[in-house]
């Protein structure tokens, strides 16, 4: 759980960094800060408003300034040993294998690997995985927080329950409600698959349960009791939208408990994107809000790997998103609703949970802030109204849902936050995972592209290949192996231990200038079961 200053006072920390290093920091709190000149602006979630220019103003001679000073926190010739590197990379890895019955796995999923590599302190990414116990299928998701980790934490805990409830038939919802009324034990809805370090908020569990119960009560009232097939796409959309609505409502109503009152406000004023997969037999649905991605790994007949994108980024690079925003607001806002590729010139993702500063009316924002705790009322960011803020809401948590029917050649699915996709091309991601899972990486010829390679350099590449092969065997987790490549790859696509060591040795105030938090889930499909489904249909 982050300290209050980590959510509501990011500018203070950023300004200190800018004074120390002579330039504005590259802060993946993704808040009102700007980047050093050498970092692309399109990698920031937030850009500065002129009112904050004095907080984040880079020096004109920033590079000479940094070269003229040395700090103890800057690594010079210190390198982590391979065991130390492995210890860092494997600290958050988790693997789950679907259990067999009578010696057989009847699920379309063999299992999954997940891992996280933080750059923020604390990490703002979250991950979740659970088996639906009252319906069929498994849920897996990654959540990328900004302006702190409060919103991503809440969404990672709550969203799967909202999805599971949305998928339940009317009679099961009635059974659960009757159990609550009579004080009987509830039917378990989800079986979680979590790393021991993954956090659950015990303090907010009652608040979260009451909101969820209100949701299923409304579903009971809306349903006439007639048996009908549940539309998974509609259930996913309803769950996303309802959770975001509850996050907003809880912040508006507040709580008598001062801790919970502050918590719900932190959740609402921070934000999070989400990319969730629901796998039921050969039916794969991906619900995406924001700029995390889902990528399908397909093995072609010749053994090569192809990447099939199952999600779309909701940002300025998506023409349909730009058109949607313009249609949702008056024509006189066409030039202001998206400026410098950001929502109102500030926010990079066009869809997200929380971020009520882009959803609430100005009057509502002022009322909540004035009646809220002092930490909220005294903060400059929370009181700041985005420019050209005329017709809210400008932001939505409604997901875009993609459906794919699994085939035997569909071998795995990669869910990852943008920290991975900023460093690696989707085709490289699929190839590396595919080669890892099949053990075929060492059979491929070395590709040097257009480089002129000397005999000595070729010897170095062969040495690196041997090291790369050994890293495959030491990585028992596909997500860990992918992170190793994302952070340590050189220009030839091989893991460079020196580079990997340098990147992992960076102090936290510098790490954010070079990379984002990375969270990955690799889901491996059971080709035999998928093929059996296909044969039954034929």
Swiss-Prot record:
Cofactor binding mode and count: Binds 2 Mn(2+) ions per subunit. Binds 2 Mg(2+) ions per subunit. Mn(2+) can substitute Mg2(+) for catalytic activity.
CDD domains for this protein: PP2Cc
Domain PPM-type phosphatase: 109-525
Cofactor(s) annotated in UniProt: Mn(2+); Mg(2+)
The enzyme's E.C. designation: 3.1.3.43
Outcome (variant: residue 120 to A): Decreases protein serine/threonine phosphatase activity
Cellular component GO terms held in the UniProt record: mitochondrion
InterPro entries assigned to the protein according to its UniProt record, in alphabetical order: PP2C (IPR015655), PP2C_BS (IPR000222), PPM-type-like_dom_sf (IPR036457), PPM-type_phosphatase-like_dom (IPR001932)
Gene3D superfamilies per record: PPM-type phosphatase domain
Protein activity control: Magnesium-dependent and calcium-stimulated. PDP1 activity strongly depends on its Ca(2+)-dependent binding to the lipoyl domain of E2 subunit of component of the pyruvate dehydrogenase complex.
The keyword Metal-binding is assigned to this record: yes
Protein name per the record: [Pyruvate dehydrogenase [acetyl-transferring]]-phosphatase 1, mitochondrial
Organism for this UniProt entry: Rattus norvegicus
